[in-house]
A protein has these predicted regions:
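N-terminal/domain-start alpha-helical segments
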Residues: 1-119
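Short, Lys/Arg-enriched segments at the junction into DNA-binding effector domains
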Residues: 114-132
Length: 132
């Protein structure tokens, strides 16, 4: 079973994404801020990160930069930030996709599956303690 880490602080979106992804047989891990995410990465197998930009203790752009520097885990931004400069920044930081809220369920699932097809799960696995 593939694991998706959702980094989101909005409870309504968390519940909706969890329901949608679990229905598609994904294991869902929830982190509500940057600190929780930093602690979760490297402690469990994660195949994909769905990342918001506006977080209570930091921003998703900086978190994406960190994730890309230390792991090979693919990132999809899922955010209300719809300015062209934000989309370009997210993709320039290495995100595999950028989806603007509100989103369509089928489109989100299709984009998630397309990203996962491009990544071999063994390549995305990081071992506890491997991040310096």
């Amino acid at each position: 079973m593939r694991s998706i880490l959702i980094v989101e602080d909005n409870e309504v979106i968390i519940k909706g994404l969890t329901y949608l992804l679990e229905k598609e047989n994904f294991h869902v891990i929830i982190c509500k801020n940057v600190n929780e995410t930093m602690n979760a990465i490297g402690k469990q197998e994660i195949h994909l990160i769905v990342l918001d930009i506006a977080l209570p203790d930091g921003n998703g752009f900086e978190l994406c930069e960190y994730i890309k520097k230390y792991t090979d885990i693919p990132v999809i931004f899922l955010t209300a930030k719809d300015e062209e400069q934000d989309v370009v920044k997210g993709l320039d930081l290495g995100a595999e996709d950028y989806i603007i809220k509100p989103f369509r369920n089928r489109e989100l699932l299709s984009r998630i599956n397309n990203v996962l097809k491009r990544f071999n799960k063994e390549d995305n696995k990081i071992v506890y303690g491997s991040i310096k």
